[in-house]
Amino acid sequence: MESYGLGQLKNFEYLDHTADIMFHTWGKDLKEALEQMVLIMNNYMVELDSVELDDSATEQTISVNGHDMDSLLFALLDEFLFVFSTEFIIFKQVQIISFDRENFSIKAIGKGVELDKSKHTTGTEIKAITYSCMKIEENPDKSDIHVIVDI
């Protein structure tokens, strides 16, 4: 199975927030920061260090649309959360392969395995993505994203 040079979790931090949990990710550009956001969401539910991409690994293509950047970010996270919640696939690698800023659409490939509680260290369940305090900041050399999720 080809890996398509899928990105791996590296740029993130958990920030305390009174309501739930806020994720902060960053990257050299918005695409990398978005990939990191999907990965940190998965990492919060299952420690990605405990996930091995073996012969059982599967790749899924996720396509989402929005009406602005915030709704696009929401849709991306919500779709990956839906796959985890319904198919129990934990994604260890994510790569955005198409990012249309004018039409607010993203196509991403996620590579992961089915959750196995005997092998994987589980974290906290995420119930929903929220728009609360959602922030996307783009600068020439770095992009940052903040998202609060309901746990």
Curated annotation (Swiss-Prot):
Keyword tRNA processing listed: yes
Name the UniProt record assigns to this protein: Protein archease-like
InterPro entries: Archease, Archease_dom, Archease_dom_sf
GO biological process, one term: tRNA splicing, via endonucleolytic cleavage and ligation
Keyword Kinase among record annotations: no
Organismal lineage: Eukaryota, Amoebozoa, Evosea, Eumycetozoa, Dictyostelia
Stated family: Belongs to the archease family.
Source organism: Dictyostelium discoideum
One annotated GO molecular function: metal ion binding
Swiss-Prot/TrEMBL keywords: Calcium, Metal-binding, tRNA processing
Gene3D superfamilies: Archease domain
Pfam families: Archease (PF01951)
Gene Ontology cellular component list: tRNA-splicing ligase complex
Biological role stated in the UniProt entry: Component of the tRNA-splicing ligase complex required to facilitate the enzymatic turnover of catalytic subunit RtcB.
Positions contributing to Ca(2+) binding: 20, 150-151
